[in-house]
Amino acid sequence: MSGTIFYYTGTGNSLWAARKIAENLKNPVSILSMIGVEEKLDMARNDITGLVFPVYIWGVPAPVLNFVKSTPNLKGDYIFAVAVNGGQVSNTLVQLKTVMAMNGLKLSSGFEIKMPSNYIPWGGPGTKEHCQKLYESAEKKIKNIASAINNKEMRDVEKGPLWQKIVFSAIYKMTFSMVPGMDKNFWVNEKCNGCGICAKECPRKAILMVPEA
């Protein structure tokens, strides 16, 4: 059995999830970033193909949509998706399933995983204790997800309640084009410890670590 998990990550949550899923599968899989890979991808038909990505403003991030639309040989006997979110998956996986169908792809199953939020204006990830509980819960969920993948279970995609679909899907549509410019007012202060993880994992290499003068 061959397989590939494609991930898109902004701060590392989705990469962590992709790696944890891979660890729990019964057969080894490749883990590749979605960024730039469509230009060099020469993939034979996989038994399993996975898409792991964060939820952006209650929907699918533009780079993930672009990846699905621009990768004609993105195939697999079993294609699954995992939407990593801070607590509100909304209609994200339904949206992905629809876009995939429009591009001749069938989503076999779709799961959501709650992780610490990285949206600072709304409070960020919370305390270490809170984050640890989320990680422990996520690992349990990942084991269940991996079991479903190993057995190639066909499942309906997971989604939020109806009110999220109505309210948040509307917000997603209104703000989708604004996302690329939303980082222009980001800054760091003395709380930054200079670990460099953000610069290392940024998919667009938009963060530069500069020594203090």
Regions found by a protein language model. Give the residues of each.
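Cysteine-centered iron-sulfur cluster-binding motifs in ferredoxin-type domains/subunits
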Residues: 185-205, 213
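Short, charged alpha-helical interaction segments and adjacent helix-coil junctions
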Residues: 176-187
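FMN-binding flavodoxin-like domain, especially the glycine-rich phosphate-binding loop
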Residues: 2-5, 9-17, 22-39, 43-176
